[in-house]
């Protein structure tokens, strides 16, 4: 059935006229009192059940609990129904698989997939928020107790799901160059997770991403079927950019960058946050700044376990001689270079241009180095690693390890989430 959202900026008889035209059986009062005497006047005029509360979301929640709702029609308008409120309502409804339609807009949810195998869905609020680093960290943490498979999706992912046995093979620079020479994206997330987590990974392709984070096309469902053949105790799904797999998992981890600030309460970022059991705020330089973002997150999702973190360099391999550091942003390259210097590594230079292949080549040619320390991102393989190996240089991979700055323990929280999921699933 359909229900409608109405307000007190419309006269009650106008609301009744619209509800009759649209054959709507009940309504939720959003607010506004200019053209009504009282809420009781509206109830008497409508001839349908009216849900109302000081908090319109509580009224909407009750309406959804008591009715089998497939679509919500928005008959409200400014100033009661602001664009920000509409996006909050859209986020609220799409999370529940309910369509939301207004005069000139329509949001329809992608069908949620439910799995028999226990699963955790890792989603991000944008690109470069550290989602893959968190995915690798989750894999490393949980493989201590469970058989884990990570299913990734990406804009450079394979057309058919591809298995990388990170638990059985060593991901070397030479191996990745051979992959790139075959015309494949060797810096895709399933290669990175196999490298950093040491677990089996399944790479999938996706194209397009909507406001809510659903993809236009992907092969994740097929990837999950491939993952099942490995008999995992737990499947970890990892999103791509601001998009994520439409799997209604048993647990959600949402990754937010501190650099996003108040933006996370706009548009449909609240949907991603409202799904979360754990929210990881990355790139927190000042705890006070992180606390501001934490308050925003708690307003959206009071039950979320929020962790304020920064990234510390974790090297996969041993550095020899002078090293250069290559990442996807100048700021992160500078920070990582400084931290590595404090650990006694001689840094000859750094670059944040992994995503700009032309500039990356120019900068590498200017440096005098023995070892390349590189994130497995963007042009890492087809430019940085290929260039280093052709010149007889050593390659060491750089992973970003989340470190709590708030006194909490993210690793412990992830273990507890997995324990709860396996317990609830009877595992």
UniProtKB/Swiss-Prot annotation:
It catalyses: (2R)-2,3-bisphosphoglycerate + ATP + H(+) = cyclic (2R)-2,3-bisphosphoglycerate + ADP + phosphate. Gene3D superfamilies: P-loop containing nucleotide triphosphate hydrolases. One of its GO terms (molecular function) is ligase activity. GO terms for biological process: gluconeogenesis. InterPro entries: Cyc_diphosphoglycerate_synth, P-loop_NTPase. Its EC number is 6.5.1.9. Transmembrane segments: none annotated. It comes from the Archaea. It is found in: Cytoplasm. It is an enzyme of class 6 (ligase). Keywords: ATP-binding, Cytoplasm, Ligase, Nucleotide-binding. GO terms for cellular component: cytoplasm. Catalyzes the formation of cyclic 2,3-diphosphoglycerate (cDPG) by formation of an intramolecular phosphoanhydride bond at the expense of ATP. Belongs to the cyclic 2,3-diphosphoglycerate synthetase family. HAMAP family: Cyc_PG_syn. This is Cyclic 2,3-diphosphoglycerate synthetase. It comes from Pyrococcus abyssi (strain GE5 / Orsay). The gene is cpgS.
């Amino acid at each position: 059935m359909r229900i409608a959202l109405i307000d007190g900026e419309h006269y009650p008889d106008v609301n009744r006229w619209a509800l009759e035209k649209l054959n709507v059986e009940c309504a939720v009062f959003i607010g506004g009192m200019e053209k009504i005497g009282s809420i009781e006047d509206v109830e008497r005029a409508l001839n349908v059940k009216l849900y109302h509360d000081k908090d319109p979301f509580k009224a909407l929640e009750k309406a959804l609990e008591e009715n089998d709702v497939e679509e919500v029609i928005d008959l409200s308008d400014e100033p009661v129904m602001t664009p920000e409120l509409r996006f909050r309502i859209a986020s609220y409804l799409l999370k529940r698989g309910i369509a939301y339609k207004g005069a000139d807009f329509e949001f329809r949810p992608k069908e949620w997939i439910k799995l028999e195998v226990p699963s955790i869905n890792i989603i991000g609020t944008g690109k470069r928020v550290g989602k893959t680093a968190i995915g690798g960290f989750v894999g490393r943490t949980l493989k201590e107790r469970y058989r884990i498979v990570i299913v990734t999706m990406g804009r450079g992912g394979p057309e058919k799901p591809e298995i990388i046995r990170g638990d059985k093979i060593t991901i070397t620079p030479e191996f990745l160059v051979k992959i790139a020479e075959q015309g494949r994206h060797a810096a895709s997330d399933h290669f990175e997770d196999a490298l950093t987590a040491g677990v089996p990974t399944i790479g999938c392709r996706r194209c397009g991403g909507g406001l809510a984070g659903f993809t236009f096309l992907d092969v994740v469902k097929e990837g999950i079927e491939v993952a099942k053949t490995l008999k995992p105790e737990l499947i970890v799904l990892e999103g791509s950019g601001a998009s994520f797999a439409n799997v209604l998992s048993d647990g959600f981890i949402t990754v937010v960058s501190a650099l996003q600030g108040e933006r996370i309460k706009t548009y449909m970022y609240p949907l991603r946050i409202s799904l979360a059991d754990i929210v990881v705020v990355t790139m927190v330089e000042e705890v006070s700044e992180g606390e501001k973002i934490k308050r925003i997150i708690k307003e959206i999702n009071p039950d979320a376990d929020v962790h304020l973190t920064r990234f510390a360099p974790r090297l996969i391999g041993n550095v020899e001689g002078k090293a250069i550091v290559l990442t996807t942003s100048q700021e992160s390259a500078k920070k990582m270079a400084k931290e590595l210097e404090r650990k006694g590594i001689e840094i000859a230079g750094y670059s944040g241009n992994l995503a700009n292949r032309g500039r990356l080549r120019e900068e590498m040619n200017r440096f005098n180095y023995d070892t390349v320390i590189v994130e497995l991102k963007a042009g890492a393989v087809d430019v940085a690693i290929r260039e280093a190996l052709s010149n007889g240089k050593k390659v060491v991979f750089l992973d970003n390890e989340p470190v709590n700055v708030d006194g909490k323990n993210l690793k412990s929280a992830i273990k507890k989430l997995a324990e709860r999921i396996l317990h609830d699933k009877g595992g």
